[in-house]
């Protein structure tokens, strides 16, 4: 994939019919009858189409995983309405006790549920199959298709050769099945140290695909497993476990990303070998690859994400700048917006870059419909209405959503002292500035409408000793209140928001931007850390309208004129709100 290829923005705002070559494959298989009237090993009827999502619990899921989740569960949902039915299994590929953890496993299940998908009773673990995997390994040994190799890891690596050079057979390749079987059982029984022996498949050390050069499928690890404890000291590797787990679960279409394309011949070799040996029967699963998600301004390498966390470039796995599911959830993204995003980008065989704006637009399109409106002043500047008496209050209201009157109104008061945005005032206005500015020469100050309130005219301003504006003074026109007959008598171009200073709710607001300044921070020989955006998080003190006081964690709003915000999942409390900016009203990244 070329790093110079332009990311796609064409579908950022439009709903399009996603391309999906996998549907064509499934349709063909169904039409051919390849997966009709299927039964499992026990003879029980099973759905024609079974997909699966099988992450390894060695880290937190990220936005790239969301594409696979939506694809596999989405296909199952769509084809469940067709003859034969369909389902998607949830499987945790937990075969490496060194890197896996219950924390990661729990977070994966939570993320899939949060995205809106349900596996019902079909939750599986690769560790559930350890006994069967061992049994099948013995069958392969007895048939002469696997052997115990006693070379060191370095020698195994060296003797594999490279793309231009064939590998060398191990000096232990011709051990008899009986000797291999005894050694393998001794490995299982803990008689050897880590790394002393491995089990390899006997395929072809001169194969043009290096993956097929007698791959290692079992290794010794004297490490307890988080589910099986100390029962095992040998563990199967991914390539061995993955395809056999698919076959045991009767997966019809094993869907994975393109980086596993070279592993497909090994997948087929293992499954077909066990079929020939009477373990499995047709139809056996087949692997299909699709292009992974490449999102601009983002990295998805687990190793590099871990580095960001451990070196404290971010504040944890759920930092709203992280591409993890827990991170983008805390940022304010909704399950619906992520599913919409995955639908819009479609599925293909060719790698490409998707612009971050496509994901952002999916969130805007979702929250535009569902998020109630509210007022927030992010850069407060005091506004004093000179001809409005201090004790007086004028009741005002605004719709919770302009398109849904049934949602009702927000109620608030107009008072003498208000908060407005500092950006809504200029001492010396530039051309085209239609908000507040003071009298200039013989000309009166500007007039603007305070939204849902009155028209006001600027009469002056005050500054501190450093010349910073600290207060803007205005007069209001009592007959100009929004919604009253007299309001139409005032024609103004500026329309700004405000909050009563007496009723404003203090709040912390966190303004997030891209974590990286480079759209391709991980490309070529770049050090991705050099592209970290030093301004990716800004924390400010703001004011919110009164109705926001008791906002609950993960409540989402459109702060009018600003964007979409969410009450922080971890830190926001009723009476002490903390809001994160999820996305602006429009794409503002340059």
From Swiss-Prot:
A motif ('KMSKS' region) lies at residues 299-303. It catalyses: tRNA(Gln) + L-glutamine + ATP = L-glutaminyl-tRNA(Gln) + AMP + diphosphate. A motif ('HIGH' region) lies at residues 55-65. The keyword Cytoplasm applies. One of its GO terms (biological process) is glutamyl-tRNA aminoacylation. L-glutamine binds at residues 93, 238. InterPro entries: aa-tRNA-synth_I_CS (IPR001412), Gln-tRNA-synth (IPR004514), Gln/Glu-tRNA_Ligase (IPR050132), Gln_tRNA_ligase_bac (IPR022861), Glu/Gln-tRNA-synth_Ib_cat-dom (IPR020058), Glu/Gln-tRNA-synth_Ib_codon-bd (IPR020059), Glu_tRNA_lig_a-bdl (IPR020061), Rbsml_bL25/Gln-tRNA_synth_N (IPR020056). Its EC number is 6.1.1.18. It is found in: Cytoplasm. PROSITE patterns: AA_TRNA_LIGASE_I. The keyword Ligase applies. It holds the Pfam family tRNA-synt_1c. GO terms for molecular function: ATP binding; glutamine-tRNA ligase activity. ATP binds at residues 56-58, 62-68, 257, 292-293. GO terms for cellular component: cytosol. SUPFAM superfamilies: Nucleotidylyl transferase (SSF52374), Ribosomal protein L25-like (SSF50715). Its main location: cytoplasm. It comes from the Bacteria. Keywords: Aminoacyl-tRNA synthetase, ATP-binding, Cytoplasm, Ligase, Nucleotide-binding, Protein biosynthesis. Belongs to the class-I aminoacyl-tRNA synthetase family. Monomer. NCBIfam families: glnS, PRK14703.1. This is Glutamine--tRNA ligase. It comes from Polynucleobacter necessarius subsp. necessarius (strain STIR1). The gene is glnS.
